């Protein structure tokens, strides 16, 4: 599932391409046809994200998108390709130089037209987002510090923390040497502060680079140049391989419906 940095980057790109201009909105698949007709030809005011949610404001009407596991935006310049497959929503605009821009949405869990009040209802149910400068990590810690639930599960709860998914969960816990099985109430305030600060750095880097890289250069096989795909993570999808730090075999098991990855030595309970 795309994590928060992906939605933040998408919102920024769509803001640059479409905001302040009239947008031709269609739904070739038909599932968004009625809403698309209401929006077609209107000016897109703003595109923002919060956690794993994207919001595109056309005046008081807001397109809300949650990509889920299989959703994906594709985009380009010039004339868009002929519609094919389950194309839920298409935007077309003039672009900055008039050559034309487009973006297509397929496979999203949610693609709805909602009100500003409904946007606020969604936001009120989410925890702080490490990519939002005004987010308050104390709000998340207040819930974590009272919970018997393992921290590895709490980090995946969007009501606790917005935007973190399976990759960031595994990697930030490893980087902070925290066991994913430690109850939330046993995580100290200092440990939480360090984890939050690390998430802010990692997720901002994810926005900038367009991918998740969590390893330090000194811990990679190839230490020069950009991180290779196989060097990008410490534990995520490295089950059966040796820990980059201590040499212990990386393990995996399911937690809250997703595969968890950790080093039993570096992240001892």
Placement of each model-derived feature along the sequence:
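Structured catalytic/nucleic-acid-binding cores of DNA maintenance enzymes
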Residues: 1-269
């Amino acid at each position: 599932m795309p994590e928060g940095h992906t939605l933040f980057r998408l919102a920024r790109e769509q803001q640059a391409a479409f905001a302040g201009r009239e947008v031709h909105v269609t739904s070739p698949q038909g599932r968004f046809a009625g809403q698309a007709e209401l929006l077609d030809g209107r000016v897109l005011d703003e595109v923002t994200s919060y956690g794993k949610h994207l919001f595109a404001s056309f005046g008081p009407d807001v397109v809300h998108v949650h990509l889920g596991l299989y959703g994906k935006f594709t985009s380009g310049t010039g004339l868009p390709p002929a519609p094919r497959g389950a194309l839920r929503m298409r935007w077309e605009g003039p672009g900055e130089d008039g050559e034309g821009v487009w973006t297509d949405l397929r496979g999203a869990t949610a693609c709805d037209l909602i009100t500003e009040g409904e946007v606020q209802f969604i936001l009120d149910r989410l925890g702080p987002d490490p990519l939002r400068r005004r987010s308050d990590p104390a709000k998340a810690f207040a819930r974590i510090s009272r919970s018997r639930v393992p921290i590895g599960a709490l980090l995946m709860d969007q009501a606790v923390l917005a935007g973190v998914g399976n990759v960031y969960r595994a990697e930030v816990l490893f980087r902070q040497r925290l066991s994913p099985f430690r109850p939330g109430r046993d995580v100290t305030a200092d440990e939480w502060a360090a984890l939050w600060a690390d998430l802010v750095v990692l997720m901002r880097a994810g926005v900038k680079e367009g991918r998740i890289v969590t390893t330090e250069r000194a811990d990679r096989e190839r230490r020069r140049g950009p991180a290779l795909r196989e060097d990008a993570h410490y534990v995520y999808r490295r089950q059966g391989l040796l820990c980059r730090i201590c040499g212990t075999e990386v393990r995996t098991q399911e937690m809250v419906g997703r595969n968890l990855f950790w080093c039993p030595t570096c992240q001892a309970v």
